[in-house]
Design a protein with these regions (language model features):
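A short, Lys/Arg-rich alpha-helix, primarily the initiator
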Residues: 1-21
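Alpha-helical residues within the helix-turn-helix
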Residues: 17, 28, 58
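Short alpha-helical DNA-recognition segment
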Residues: 21-39
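DNA major-groove recognition helix of helix-turn-helix
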Residues: 41, 52, 71
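Short, basic-rich loop-to-helix N-cap that marks the start of a DNA-contacting helix
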Residues: 44-55
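Short C-terminal boundary/hinge segments that cap the last helix of small helical domains
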Residues: 61-73
Length: 73
């Protein structure tokens, strides 16, 4: 049985661009490994911890809704 992909997208690339910040800078600020943030940025993550989401929002000065969006199916 194959699992259907989720419909949540991470808009990290847009937020980084708007804030003139690199993924490496964000990784350092939030204390998450660069490869893990890359997986998240490229929408390959299957889950995100609330603690990680909180740190991302704090570093990017945004709300969770700014980072997540529902993809149209």
């Amino acid at each position: 049985m194959t699992e259907e992909p989720h419909a949540i997208e991470i808009t990290l690339d847009r937020l980084l661009l708007e804030r003139h910040m690199t993924l490496a800078e964000l990784a350092e600020r939030v204390g998450v490994a660069y490869p893990n943030l890359s997986i998240l940025k490229n929408n390959r993550a299957r889950a995100v911890r609330f603690s990680t989401l909180t740190r991302l929002c704090e570093a990017l000065e945004c709300q969770p809704g700014d980072l997540l969006r529902l993809r149209e199916r």
